[in-house]
Amino acid sequence: MSQANAATKASSDVFFNASLEDIDPEIFGAIRNELGRQRHEIELIASENIVSRAVLEAQGSILTNKYAEGYPGKRYYGGCQYVDVVEELAIERAKKLFGAEFANVQPNSGSQMNQAVFLALLQPGDTFMGLDLNSGGHLTHGSPVNMSGKWFNVVSYGVRKDDHLLDMDEVARLARENKPKLILAGGTAYSRIWDWKRFREIADEVGACLMVDMAHIAGLVAGGQHPSPVPHAHVCTTTTHKSLRGPRGGMILTNDADIAKKINSAVFPGLQGGPLMHVIAGKAVAFAEALKPEFKLYAKNVVDNARALAEELKSHGLDIVSGGTDNHLMLVDLRPKNATGKRAEAALGRANITCNKNGIPFDPEKPFVASGVRLGTPAGTTRGFGVAEFKEIGSLIAEVLDGLKVANSDEGNAAVEQAVKEKVIALTGRFPMYGYQG
């Protein structure tokens, strides 16, 4: 073997066999530190969850090497016979999980899945209705700073001021007055049951298409803990993470063959090129997990834990927007503790409790300050936390907020936060995750 060939072989051996730790210790160190954070902190961000080891393996597989523009059986590249199997499994499992006739599993994110529906069903300048961001909607539901708010005429509906529940009379009135081409139901910070049947009745009355974004509650729908929108909506979108417990990505479901054709064309070639086959593999694995009987118990536990957390927080003098929760999340109004969302998020973070500041309906504060925090139970439930643990977590949150009220500063109350942090580490230590060192 020549010297040049020997050097090439040695380089190839390193390329295919050296570990991440050997090749890039900086990235390895950041990942190791993030694993430590996830292991030792209580994750209460409602849009986050923890995937299984099997999903991690699928998403970190050699499928990342493969381009597969198009759809199974109709690719623009050769060598797709095995990734076709992967995508077909993901599609069939998604259809079975949600009782849908058609599924597109290629969207790379929640924003892109919603953009694909708009591309398929709307023209620039068309009118659509969506839940106002301040009432619990999403940026892609018509926010002025988002493409959805820039390209279309958006009519927003909201919640009532007295009880923070959806005002369906207002939805009907706005629909009759504005004759939207599409009505979008669903949100990111609404803790009550959605009346899909009523939304469909309103849509039919004005000749609109009903789109449901069930990104936050898809796992609860799959687990039988929230009514399914699939029988009522013309088209449904959902992310595949959050309560569904899969990799980060999106999916579109429909029972309408004509809409399915438009959706497929909108996703590819309209919006995306080659799909992320390693992510689609992770989606397929997560769907298989969600089809198992134990996932129904998981979904029930998520809701039971959320209700327990909400009641515990109320017992400590905090207000829960709409008075409680029917799903996996809640908005906590911090004004009884004279706190802002910004201060509370930082103080809880120092105590190893992770959440996000969030505006509440009719919030007097700016979005980056906010009067509330949003809390969710999917990740903690995945770790094995039950009602007892979430009651303890509620008490720990109140302890931090009471300390913050006494300190009345951005620096918080170091003594209280350290004491709570030690309790959090003790709690999380009883519920280990993954077998890696961290």
Curated annotation (Swiss-Prot):
Residues the entry annotates as binding (6S)-5,6,7,8-tetrahydrofolate: 133, 137-139
N6-(pyridoxal phosphate)lysine: residues carrying this PTM: 242
Superkingdom is Bacteria
**What are the names of the required cofactors?**
pyridoxal 5'-phosphate
GO terms in the biological process aspect are: glycine biosynthetic process from serine; tetrahydrofolate interconversion
UniProt-listed InterPro entries: PyrdxlP-dep_Trfase, PyrdxlP-dep_Trfase_major, PyrdxlP-dep_Trfase_small, Ser_HO-MeTrfase, Ser_HO-MeTrfase-like, Ser_HO-MeTrfase_PLP_BS, SHMT-like_dom
According to its record, what are the GO cellular component terms? cytosol
* Reaction catalysed by this enzyme: (6R)-5,10-methylene-5,6,7,8-tetrahydrofolate + glycine + H2O = (6S)-5,6,7,8-tetrahydrofolate + L-serine
Pinpoint the site Plays an important role in substrate specificity: 241
| Pfam families attached to this UniProt entry | SHMT
Which Enzyme Commission number(s) are listed?
A: 2.1.2.1
> What are the recorded GO MF terms, alphabetically?
glycine hydroxymethyltransferase activity; pyridoxal phosphate binding
Q: How does it assemble?
A: Homodimer.
**NCBIfam families per the UniProt record, alphabetical:** PRK00011.1
Q: What is this protein called?
A: Serine hydroxymethyltransferase
